[in-house]
Amino acid sequence: MPKGNKKPNEKKEELEKFAKELQGSDSDEDAVVIEQPTVEPKLPQNDSSSSNKIVLSQAEKDLLRTELDKTEEEISTLKQVLSARQKHAAELKRKLGLTPFSELSQDINRSLKTVTDTDAYQKTAEVAAATSDTVKEKWNDMRNSSLFKSFESKLGSALNNAKMAASTSIDHLAGAARGPSQTGTPVAEEAKPIS
């Protein structure tokens, strides 16, 4: 009989025979054992239904319902256990004095520490410090320049003149408000420059 014309049963028998020969004749530890694949039986399907529903016997339905009930009961039990553990954790936190605010602040502090410990943050802080030092040096150099000192003195004298004018105007208005019945005129005090 040619090889291509063998029936499936004959092929299966030959494979089993070959596997037995391998198991019996080879004593090496690395020998390959060929096992026959297990085939799961297919459940009958109702071909008349367009939704391809699986048809189950009453015993299978009862078994599935029992398993569903057990699973739902386990879920309920786990929810109760979780709730009890959460209450216990809340009680322990209360005894330790941990409030939601303190937990939040601890989380923020931990996050900040994590960020400040990174290389990127360290490098950025170094660059910012160097930039700050450079700006301070430039500012001091500018303040010590003759142009800045000249501008500062002119601005200071203009400010003093404005204060003196405002003071004189207020004194003049105060004198006018007193009226002619009072003897003498108010003497304008000489404004002292603010230094």
UniProtKB/Swiss-Prot annotation:
Coiled-coil blocks: 48-97
GO cellular component terms listed in the entry, alphabetical order: cytoplasm
Question: Which keywords, in A-to-Z order, does the entry hold?
Answer: Coiled coil
* Bias (Basic and acidic residues) ranges: 7-20
Superkingdom per UniProt: Eukaryota
Where along the chain is composition biased (Polar residues)? 45-54
Q: Which InterPro entries match?
A: TPD52
Give one Pfam family.
Answer: TPD52
Q: Where is the region Disordered?
A: 1-54, 173-195
The cross-references to PANTHER family, in alphabetical order and at most eight, read: TUMOR PROTEIN D52
Instruction: Give the family per the record.
Output: Belongs to the TPD52 family.
What protein name does the entry list?
A: Uncharacterized protein F13E6.1
